[in-house]
């Protein structure tokens, strides 16, 4: 368990105090993949770097388990950083070392015996799919391969927590998907707590269990990804979701002017995504429907579907009640 208790961070620049992170309270459970999303300058990098004290907090407390990280001395901090691995946007590999040498580096610093280092490096390179590249140098690798080296290096000391600081933002979409798949696999197989920061809701949707949304250094929304993604409350969150779904809400509402009737957005979650609920309720209530937009996708391992439909004729109130009774979330866009 990672607990932020009124944790905050400020800087003094030219005699002025700049607040990077306002006091916040947050809990991250053991074994979770927890996402932190925000635009540039929102405070997300500051937040994640407070966990291993690459940034020093101005005030508040940070607990990992029962240990107060904010109270650790230098010896305790070194021990903490062996339990908290980190990967970075720009990989931060040592160009003069081979792939194997980069992965071995934290073990060498810890004074691990050579035979144990060699065995651990071989195990980790196999886990990230780079066993054939052990003797190559970073300059000979693709971006995705470099990030896999970074992941292997971060896992070398068998950490309990893995911090991912914009780990996929420098990668193309296909490589991003493969790295996210690897992180999800590591979470399942090793039970690691993963804290991931990003400015892309699509990354959150693919791998995270819960998410926190930051805006101008403030925590504005948090909850399970299914809830936050499908029913965003804060304007910042709604913008992230619209960008991820490539939906222009203003354009969509202009399209509404071309159709009559009551317009609703129906959200299906889990196995109900594949049930013929719309057709059944239309028959039962006598309503006609016009599908204006729709999609079926997944949030991590959970299928979901969304339909925007115009309802005409029949008993529309009964149809709405029928959708709710079937476990469908109904949002009235025009009554």
UniProtKB/Swiss-Prot annotation:
One GO cellular component, as annotated: plasma membrane
Binding site for ATP: 38-45
Highest taxon of the lineage: Bacteria
Membrane topology classification: Peripheral membrane protein
Keywords assigned: Amino-acid transport, ATP-binding, Cell inner membrane, Cell membrane, Membrane, Nucleotide-binding, Translocase, Transport
Catalyzed reactions: L-methionine(out) + ATP + H2O = L-methionine(in) + ADP + phosphate + H(+); D-methionine(out) + ATP + H2O = D-methionine(in) + ADP + phosphate + H(+)
Molecular function GO labels: ABC-type D-methionine transporter activity; ATP binding; ATP hydrolysis activity
Xref: SMART domains: AAA, NIL
SUPFAM superfamilies: ACT-like, P-loop containing nucleoside triphosphate hydrolases
Enzyme class: translocase
Cellular localization per UniProt: Cell inner membrane
EC number annotated for this UniProt entry: 7.4.2.11
Domain ABC transporter: 2-241
Function: Part of the ABC transporter complex MetNIQ involved in methionine import. Responsible for energy coupling to the transport system.
Oligomer and partners: The complex is composed of two ATP-binding proteins (MetN), two transmembrane proteins (MetI) and a solute-binding protein (MetQ).
Family: Belongs to the ABC transporter superfamily. Methionine importer (TC 3.A.1.24) family.
PANTHER family assigned to the protein according to its UniProt record, in alphabetical order: AMINO ACID IMPORT ATP-BINDING PROTEIN, METHIONINE IMPORT ATP-BINDING PROTEIN METN
UniProt name for this protein: Methionine import ATP-binding protein MetN
Organism: Xanthomonas campestris pv. campestris (strain ATCC 33913 / DSM 3586 / NCPPB 528 / LMG 568 / P 25)
């Amino acid at each position: 368990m990672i607990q932020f208790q009124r944790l905050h961070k400020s800087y003094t620049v030219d005699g002025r105090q700049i607040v990077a992170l306002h006091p916040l309270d947050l809990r991250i459970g053991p074994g979770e993949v927890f996402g932190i999303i925000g635009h540039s300058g929102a405070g997300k990098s500051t937040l994640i770097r407070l966990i291993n004290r690459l940034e020093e907090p101005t005030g508040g407390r940070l607990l990992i388990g029962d240990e107060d990280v904010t109270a650790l001395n230098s010896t305790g901090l070194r021990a903490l950083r062996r339990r908290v691995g980190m990967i970075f946007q720009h990989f931060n590999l040592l160009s003069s070392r081979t792939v194997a040498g980069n992965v071995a580096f934290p073990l060498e610093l810890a004074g691990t015996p050579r035979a144990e280092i060699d065995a651990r490096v071989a195990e980790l390179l196999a886990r990230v799919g780079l066993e054939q590249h052990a003797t190559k140098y970073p300059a000979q690798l693709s971006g995705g391969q470099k990030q896999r080296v970074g992941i292997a290096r971060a896992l070398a000391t068998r950490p309990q927590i893995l911090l991912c600081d914009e780990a996929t933002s420098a990668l193309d979409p296909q490589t991003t998907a493969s790295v996210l798949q690897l992180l999800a696999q590591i979470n399942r197989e090793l039970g690691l707590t993963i804290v991931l920061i990003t400015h892309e809701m699509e990354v959150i949707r693919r791998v995270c269990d819960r998410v926190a949304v930051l805006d101008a250094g403030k925590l504005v929304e948090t909850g399970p990804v299914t809830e936050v993604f499908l029913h965003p409350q804060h304007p910042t969150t709604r913008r992230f979701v619209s960008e991820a779904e490539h939906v222009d809400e203003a354009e969509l509402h202009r399209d509404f002017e071309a159709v009559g009737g009551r317009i609703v957005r129906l959200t299906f979650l889990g196995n109900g995504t594949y049930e013929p609920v719309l057709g059944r309720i239309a028959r039962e209530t006598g309503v006609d429907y016009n599908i204006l937009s729709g999609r079926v996708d997944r949030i991590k391992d959970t299928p979901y579907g969304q339909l925007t439909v115009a309802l005409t004729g029949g008993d529309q109130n009964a149809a709405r009640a029928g959708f709710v009774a079937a476990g469908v979330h109904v949002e009235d866009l025009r009554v």
